[in-house]
Amino acid sequence: MKIAGHLLRHKLQGTKRFATVLQLEPLHTCNLTCTGCGRIREYSTSMKDVMPLEDCLKAAIECDAPMVSICGGEPLIYPEIEALVNGLLSQRRIVYICTNGMWMRKKMRDYLAVSFAQEPETVLPQLNRLGAEKLLTPSEIEQIKKGPKNPGKPVIAPSGWMYWNVHLDGLEKTHDIIVEREGVFRECVLAMRMAKILGFQVATNTTVYRETDVAEIEHLFEYLATLGVDGHTISPGYDYDAAKKDMAKRLGLDPANFFLTRRATIEKFARATIWGKKYPLFGTPVYLEFVAGLRDLTCSAWAIPTRNIKGWKAPCYFMTDGHYATFKELQEKVDWSKYGVVDGVAKDPRCENCMVQCGYEPSATIGLQGKPGDTWKNIWFNFGPRPRPKNHPDPKIVFNGISAAAAKPKQEAVVARG
């Protein structure tokens, strides 16, 4: 409702351009080197730099987006991530922590230590359950019972305004290949299970590439339903410059074999509208119609601005033509007519294959190129009953990577329990 109110206010005011979501990158340091990500290469000269906490909070106030997506880099590495999350929540903003999942359990253990010190009777049953389900070790439980190492430091606690947004690009084998490390998928599953037990909201984000098996994505969503995951976002893999250069130079691979063209996106997303009815996808049905090739949209990258260590990134999350000191300068000085695809013609060659969510979802949300019935369609999609998949895939299909190779069926079964 907060986002709906934000949209209505700007429409009544006749605002030409405004932010709907802030992509906040407080740092670009990461603990993984994912295939298809160009951030590390693009910002290689400033990998050790971080945004001051004050600048992060000021950026949210400056653009006044109702939702902030904290990304990077890996945001849980940011030294003041707890203060940042709590600061944004105090501003009454919806917060998504976009994480690879590797540090999630660590941050939740910090939360448990503070909670146990305050309400041991309430937290003890949770600790017992987490221990029984192998989500905490006995030594971790004992450490939690000793209380927080730094009692004055804030923690990330469950909130109706916050989501863990976990990156998952497929089932175990596929995801571990893409993030270039075995065991990451398994850790994500453990972290999501722990989060749901503790009362956190959990979402996932998935990028579809040329070699992605669409059936595998459906199995992924069906499996995540057994964990109680609240919803998903899904977007096509776009061949932006930094990612292409990283793939070619670091991995010696041809980006054309990995990323999607516009035509290939439509082929991969042919069932997108069906997914919207079967799975709890976040966003709009209008965007799903767009990626399925059923309608046209123009890019509105100005609605999802990116703020990072160098300033306000222009023109969008993927393309970099410069950085601006203020949000106002970004909105007023960028010639937005130079970008996007209009009537099948790319205004900029780099935009030709882009159909990504952060460029086109806001167009669907705001109602650009709207059709009769779109508003009610979007309202029902977001506020009506959420679909819950009934099919539950065999754990052997889900854990088809290092788990299968290690041949540990007992451990596999524990992880698979919802």
Would you name each region that the model predicts?
Residues F18, K313-G418:
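Flexible mid-to-C-terminal extensions adjoining Fe-S/redox cofactors in radical SAM and related proteins
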Residues S44, P75, M102, L171, ...:
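Residue-level marker for beta-strand->alpha-helix junctions and adjacent short loops that shape enzyme
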Residues M51, I94, E121-Q126, L130-E133, ...:
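Radical SAM enzyme [4Fe-4S]-AdoMet core and its adjacent flexible, acidic
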Residues I40, C71, H167, S235, ...:
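Conserved residues at the C-terminal ends of beta-strands
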Residues T29, T33, T298, R350-N353:
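The −1 position to Zn-ligating cysteines in a subset of zinc-ribbon hairpins
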Residues M1-W161, G367, P409-K410, G418:
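Conserved alpha-helical substructure of the radical SAM core
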Residues I77-Y78, M104-R105, R210-D213, H323:
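Alpha-helix N-cap/loop-to-helix initiation residues
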Residues G38-E42, E172, M247-D254, L330-D335:
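Short glycine/proline- and charge-enriched loop/turn segments
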